Regions:
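N-terminal Sec-pathway targeting helices
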Residues: 26-39
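An N-terminal assembly and electron-transfer interface module characteristic of large anaerobic redox
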Residues: 41-584
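Low-complexity, intrinsically disordered or signal/transmembrane-proximal segments
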Residues: 3-4, 14, 18
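Intrinsically disordered, low-complexity regions
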Residues: 16-18, 33, 46
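Juxtamembrane low-complexity tails/linkers enriched in Ser/Thr-Pro and polybasic
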Residues: 17-26
Length: 584
C-alpha cells in the first residue's frame, strides 16, 4: 500500500511539472532518478509487507433482503435516535422505516405532529413492529417537549389517536417510549441567578423528599430567589408529564401499547425529577401492566434498546450477559449526568433488551466489559489489566461488548488508545460504545451486541450470517470513529478553532453561514485520523463470521461526517469499511 502511495505521489509531481497535455520526454538523468525512486519505493513496500504480511483477500459486498420491517417515529432527528437505529436494524436484517425528513424536527424547530400522525396511520400494516416516541408525536421532539406544554385536551387527543391506531391494526405491536423532564429548568426561565437558585432548590427538595436531612434555612433562602411564576412553570412541567405517563400506563394495561418505556433524561441522584419518578414507580406497581412498563435512565438510546428487545422477543431469545469491570470500584461509580451507579444502569439496560445477567462468562452468550475511567480517582492504572483481560476474551472467541466510559470526556481516560498501542484486534469486538452518558453507552453496546447475536441464531443461513457480521462491523467502526476519535480527540480542537473565529457558544453555531468551513475542518481531522487508524493491526485483524468457517477482513475504511444540528456536540458520521474474505 505504501509502495503504491509513493508511486502515485511521484506521478502527481510529474503531472504538475508539465503544462501541456502531452508528457515532455524526461532527460536521461531524470529517468535515472525516477527509476531509483521507484526502486526505493518498491523496497520500502516489500519491507512493509514483510513486517505486516497481508492475507490473501477476496473483496465481498453485503447482499441480503430484509427479513422484516420496523416503523420508527424517532425521539428527534439526531443520528443516535434515527440513523443509528436503522444501522442496528441492518445487523439483524430489519428494514427500519422512519418518517420523511420534512416531517421531523430540526434542533429547536419542532416536528410536524399532525403530519407524523398521518404518516404513521398511512404506513402501518398488519403485523408491523412500531417504535414510537411519544415526545415526537405529541410535542415534535425532545427539545420541544422540554420547552412546550401539552394541555389535557392535547394529551387526550393523542390517547384517542393511539387507541384508534391499535383498533385499525390490532396485530401491529406498538412499543412506545416517553421521556421525563430533566432537572435543568426550561429555557423560558431565563434569569441566570434564578436558574441557579432553582437548580439548587430542586436538589434540596429532592433530598428532603428522599428522607434525608437538609438545611431548611438554605432551602428557604433559595426559594426566596425564585419567582412564584417560575416555580409554578417548573413544577407544572413535571406534573404535566406525570399525568401523561399515567395515561400511557393505562394504554399499556388495556393492550393498546405492547410495551412502554419511561426514560429519565440527564438525571441526578436527588431533585424534583426523582419525585415524579417515584410517583410513577408506584403507579406502575399498582397497574396490571408492570411486566410491560419499564422505568429506565436515559433517552437517546432507548429506541436502540427497544429494537434489540423486539428482535429478541420475536426469536424467543434472551441473551445471557456476564458483566465484568476493569476495577471493582467502577460498579458503584456514579458518572456525570446519571442518577444511579454504573452497575444499576447496566442492570436496567440488560432487562430492557430482554436479557438476563449470569454469574460466569462460561454461562454467558455475551461478556459486557465496562471501564469507567476517572483520572482524579486514580482509575487509569486499571487499563493495562483491562487490555489483558479483553485479549483473553477475544482469543477464546467470546462475544465481547466494550463500554469505554470517561468521567471527563477527554482523550486521557479511555481504554481505546491503549488497545491500539497493543495491536488489540478491535474488529473482533462484538460492540463498542463510549458516547456521552453511562446509559447512552451501555444501551448502545448492549443493543448492538444483542442484535449481532440474533443475526447468528441457528436457523440463520451462511449468507445472512456474513451480511450480519459485515453490518455489525460497519456499526462498530462508526462507533470507534465517533465515540473515541471525534468525541474524545477532535471535538476540543474544533471547538477551540471555532472560538478563535469568534464563536462563544459552540452549542449554538451559526452553521447557516459557516457550514462549509466548519464541516471541512471536521472532515480534515477525521480523514487524518482514519489515514493512521486504517494502517493499524487493530483494524486490519481478520475476524470470524460466527457459525461458519469464514474469516473476513477490512482492507479499506472511509467515512463521511457533518453536523446534523448547528452545534458540535454530535456529528452525523457514516463509516464505510470495505470487506474481503480471507483465504484459509
Amino acid at each position: 500500500m505504501i509502495y503504491y502511495e509513493i508511486c502515485n505521489k511521484i506521478l502527481a509531481v510529474q503531472r504538475r511539472e508539465h503544462t501541456r497535455k502531452e508528457l515532455i520526454p524526461l532527460s536521461k538523468r531524470k529517468r535515472g532518478l525516477l527509476l531509483l525512486a521507484l526502486l526505493l519505493a518498491l523496497a520500502l513496500g516489500l519491507w512493509h509487507l514483510a513486517i505486516h504480511p497481508q492475507p490473501a483477500l477476496t473483496p465481498v459486498a453485503s447482499e441480503r433482503a430484509p427479513q422484516g420491517r420496523v416503523l420508527l417515529v424517532p425521539l428527534d432527528s439526531r443520528p443516535p435516535c434515527r440513523a443509528h437505529v436503522a444501522a442496528l436494524g441492518r445487523i439483524a436484517g430489519r428494514d427500519v422505516v422512519a418518517p420523511p425528513g420534512a416531517l421531523m424536527d430540526y434542533y429547536s424547530a419542532p416536528g410536524d405532529t399532525a403530519g407524523l400522525r398521518a404518516w404513521l396511520q398511512e404506513t402501518i400494516a398488519p403485523g408491523d413492529t412500531v417504535l414510537l416516541s411519544i415526545d415526537q408525536l405529541l410535542y415534535g421532539g425532545l427539545l420541544a417537549a422540554r420547552e412546550h406544554t401539552a394541555t389535557e385536551t392535547a394529551q387526550d387527543a393523542l390517547v384517542a389517536y393511539l387507541r384508534a391506531l391499535h383498533a385499525a391494526q390490532p396485530t401491529a405491536r406498538i412499543y412506545a417510549f416517553s421521556i421525563l423532564p430533566r432537572l435543568t429548568p426550561q429555557d423560558t426561565i431565563d434569569g441566570y441567578e434564578e436558574r441557579r437558585a432553582l437548580i439548587a432548590y430542586s436538589r434540596l427538595v429532592g433530598r428532603e423528599a428522599a428522607g434525608l436531612a437538609i438545611d431548611t434555612a438554605e432551602r428557604d433562602r433559595l426559594r426566596a430567589k425564585i419567582s412564584d411564576a417560575s416555580l409554578a412553570a417548573y413544577e407544572g412541567h413535571f406534573d404535566e408529564n406525570a399525568r401523561l405517563n399515567e395515561k400511557l400506563i393505562a394504554l399499556t394495561e388495556d393492550g393498546t401499547l405492547a410495551r412502554l418505556v419511561l426514560g429519565q433524561d440527564d438525571g441526578e441522584p436527588y431533585g424534583i425529577p426523582n419525585i415524579e419518578k417515584y410517583r410513577l414507580q408506584q403507579a406502575i406497581e399498582a397497574s396490571g401492566a408492570r411486566a410491560r412498563v419499564t422505568l429506565t435512565h436515559g433517552a437517546d438510546e432507548i429506541a436502540q434498546t427497544l429494537l434489540a428487545a423486539c428482535v429478541s422477543e420475536q426469536q424467543g431469545f434472551s441473551p445471557r450477559v456476564f458483566v465484568a469491570y476493569a476495577e471493582p470500584a467502577a460498579a458503584a461509580r456514579v458518572m456525570p449526568y446519571m442518577a444511579v451507579s454504573v452497575d444499576a444502569t447496566t442492570d436496567e439496560k440488560i432487562r430492557l433488551i430482554g436479557g438476563r445477567r449470569v454469574d460466569t462468562p462460561e454461562d454467558a452468550d455475551l461478556v459486557l466489559y465496562l471501564i469507567a475511567s476517572d483520572a482524579e480517582k486514580g482509575s487509569l492504572d486499571a487499563r493495562a489489566a483491562a487490555c489483558t483481560a479483553l485479549s483473553g476474551l477475544v482469543e477464546r472467541e467470546k462475544p465481547t461488548a466494550l463500554v469505554d466510559l470517561s468521567k471527563h470526556f477527554d482523550a486521557r481516560e479511555p481504554l481505546l488508545p491503549l488497545l491500539l498501542a497493543r495491536d488489540f484486534p478491535l474488529t473482533r469486538l462484538t460492540a463498542y460504545a463510549g458516547w456521552n452518558t453511562t446509559s447512552n453507552a451501555v444501551g448502545t453496546a448492549l443493543a448492538e451486541a444483542s442484535l449481532a447475536l440474533a443475526a447468528q441464531r441457528p436457523d440463520t443461513s451462511k449468507e445472512q450470517r456474513e451480511a450480519g457480521a459485515m453490518a455489525n462491523e460497519t456499526f462498530l467502526q462508526g462507533r470507534i470513529l465517533e465515540d473515541y476519535f471525534y468525541l474524545k480527540e477532535d471535538i476540543d480542537p474544533i471547538n477551540r478553532a471555532l472560538r478563535k473565529a469568534g464563536y462563544t457558544n459552540t452549542a449554538d453555531l451559526d452553521l447557516e453561514h459557516n457550514h462549509r468551513w466548519a464541516t471541512a475542518m471536521l472532515q480534515r481531522r477525521l480523514a487524518a485520523q482514519i489515514a493512521v487508524y486504517k494502517q493499524t493491526r487493530s483494524l486490519r485483524a481478520p475476524f470470524p463470521v460466527p457459525g461458519t468457517d469464514e474469516m473476513l477482513a477490512i482492507y479499506d475504511l472511509r467515512a463521511s461526517a457533518g453536523f446534523p444540528w448547528p452545534r458540535t456536540f454530535e456529528i452525523d458520521l457514516t463509516a464505510q469499511p470495505f470487506f474481503a474474505r480471507v483465504a484459509p
